[in-house]
């Protein structure tokens, strides 16, 4: 089933092609199972689609699985709680070394409530694949109108992170772009944007990170360390908890 916007914002059309026959059959079966008139179910589905399109949308660029959760997991939890639609792109899952990382990332994304996709770029070789990464971001920018994009800070010293952020700056020129901190990769960073968080957001962030059993050996996965960072950022904002960001670009009209 392919949705198409009509001439007016409130008008939606759908077309059925051979490729989507199974979707249409599923749609009819759903109506039958619920003893519901197809036209009523279609009306409800259209209404749901319109409401979803009205949601503010955030995209999180995660060079490796776990970067998104480490850098802005609490903020993701808060945005979703407030009705935002959040999508994350994991660019590398290191499948050759840790095949289970894919499942870990999927479970983490589900806990936070965000949609996700997992790509298969080779870790440490993002500079070589820069053009392919640029194209992926370009395609996303054409497909969705994001209000907010998260990416590693511009001073992140990891080469993979640097490529993702550089290409994000090229592509996402019409929306707010914030750089999330990963302290072990940031020797010099200016955090000038802080998002206040509640304890429940931090709990969800840590629960999501606990899915990454393969990564728990790293010092930055220590629960006390994770809590100390959000507490420190909270002190800077005079609030119990916060996550800090580098303001790369702000477009206020899309955030209000």
Q: Where is each model-derived feature located?
A:
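Short aromatic-enriched loop/helix-cap "lid" or pocket-rim segments at secondary-structure transitions
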Residues: 72, 99-101, 162, 188-193
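Short beta-strand segments
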Residues: 87-90, 150, 179-181
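Active-site rim/loop-helix segments in enzyme catalytic domains that contact anionic ligands
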Residues: 2-144, 170-174, 229, 247
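Histidine-centered beta-alpha loop that forms part of the nucleotide-sugar donor binding/catalytic region
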Residues: 63, 153-154, 181-183
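Active-site environment of divalent metal-dependent phosphoester hydrolases
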Residues: 68, 95-97, 124, 156-161, ...
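The feature marks non-catalytic terminal segments
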Residues: 2-3, 8-26, 108-114, 143-144, ...
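Conserved beta-sheet core of the metallophosphoesterase superfamily
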Residues: 160, 164, 168-171, 175-178
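Proline-aspartate-enriched helix->loop->beta-strand connector
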Residues: 114, 137-155, 161, 165
